[in-house]
Amino acid sequence: DLFAPIATSVNYFGPAGSGQHAKMANQIMIAGTMTGLTEMLVYGKAAGLDLNEMLTVVGSGAGANWSLSNYGPRMLQGDYTPGFFAKHFLKDLRIALDEAKKMHLQLPATQLAEQLYANMVATGKGDLGTQGLVTMNDHWRNA
């Protein structure tokens, strides 16, 4: 009941620091989802597909996920208003990679996402939402 005003659910992952690791695991998943969503849209655009139809079809199958449903349509409309700032996401990816290194883990997909978001932030787009990653693709911008 203590957290009712600020949370719909409360989860216990273990001792101090475990919740932070759970958040980093979530951010690792989002990194893969956002890079995949970006490349799916770029590929579909290059192939001349109806991107709205593609979002509908992919969203009703195995590729369905929150980012696709919520950010996909916004990306098509050019709406990069942040739900979560890219610069803050980059910070989280760096924390996740630092923690992974301490555990002797290699996370190559997360490393790639970190590089992509670092480039986005370096070009002055850190205040866009995470879905703004699509703006970094030359084909998306120039097609």
What are these regions (language model features)?
Residues 18-141:
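Helical "substrate-binding/catalytic lid" subdomain
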